[in-house]
């Protein structure tokens, strides 16, 4: 087929050259285009010492081209037969006779592998795992299967219905204490204690903030008047307090502190 397309392209090139530059009277080539592209293609092929190709049946022409190349003709109406003939030419077994599973199994057999599919994909998967030296996996319960896989890896099974217990078991495997028993505050405090920090929340967020500040070496901050607290903070950091009632004065004071 590629040869046919090449020939047509050659003919087109010859024809275009003919139009672009008419041949002189002394040329041994015939003029080309008289209205029938097939006749013209055949004339061009004849000039090249090749047989004409197209007389109306593309299959016959393809087979003729294959014959020119020393190959057997291929297509007589049944693409499967033709494919099998091509495989035979390459020294391969034919593949498809109507049952794709049989064909797949035949291919696996060629590779020295056992056939796989007889109707139950789980059985087939297990058979494949067995071939690899692994245990079968799925019998209906994904949790049991996961645990079996973990056991194969030398790990303990994990999930028996309570995700918190399972999380704690995992933490225990890592040498860590379990965390959650129902009270997130207690758990947070336990975690802080593990890190060498004091527990924090006991009901009053202001007390907790002050407790944090004290732990860091700062005095507690909020006792009811946010302006007083800001002034105390500014004083502690060596900055003079800013706001006494007039925001413009405060802004100007801030600018003055910056040398502006």
Curated annotation (Swiss-Prot):
Residues 1-20 form the signal peptide. It is found in: Secreted. The keyword Disulfide bond does not apply. Disruption phenotype: Leads to complete loss of pathogenicity when hum3 is also deleted. Keywords: Secreted, Signal, Virulence. It comes from the Eukaryota. The keyword Secreted applies. Its main location: secreted. Rsp1 is processed by the subtilisin-like endoprotease kex2. Cleavage by kex2 generates 11 peptides. Repetitive secreted protein essential for pathogenic development. Hum3 and rsp1 together are pathogenicity proteins that share an essential function in early stages of the infection. This is Repetitive secreted protein 1. The lineage of its organism: Eukaryota, Fungi, Dikarya, Basidiomycota, Ustilaginomycotina.
């Amino acid at each position: 087929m590629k040869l046919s397309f090449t020939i047509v392209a050659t003919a087109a090139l010859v024809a275009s050259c003919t139009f672009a530059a008419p041949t002189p009277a002394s040329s041994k080539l015939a003029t080309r285009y008289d209205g029938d592209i097939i006749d013209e293609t055949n004339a061009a092929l004849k000039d090249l010492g090749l047989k004409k190709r197209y007389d109306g049946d593309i299959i016959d022409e393809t087979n003729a081209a294959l014959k020119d190349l020393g190959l057997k003709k291929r297509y007589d109406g049944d693409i499967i037969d033709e494919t099998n003939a091509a495989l035979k030419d390459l020294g391969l077994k034919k593949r498809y006779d109507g049952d794709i599973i049989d064909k797949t199994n035949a291919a696996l057999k060629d590779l020295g592998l056992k056939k796989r599919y007889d109707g139950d994909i789980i059985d087939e998967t297990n058979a494949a795992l067995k071939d690899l030296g692994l245990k079968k996996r799925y019998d209906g319960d994904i949790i049991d299967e996961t645990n079996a896989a973990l056991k194969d890896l030398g790990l303990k099974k994990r999930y028996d219905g309570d995700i918190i217990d399972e999380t704690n078991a995992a933490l225990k495997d890592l040498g860590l204490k379990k965390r959650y028993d129902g009270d997130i505050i207690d758990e947070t405090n336990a975690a802080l204690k593990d890190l060498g920090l004091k527990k924090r929340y006991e009901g009053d967020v202001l007390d907790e903030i002050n407790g944090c500040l004290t732990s860091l070496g700062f005095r507690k901050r909020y006792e009811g008047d946010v302006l007083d607290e800001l002034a105390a903070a500014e004083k502690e950091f060596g900055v003079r307090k800013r706001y006494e009632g007039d925001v413009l004065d405060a802004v100007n004071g801030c600018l003055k502190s910056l040398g502006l």
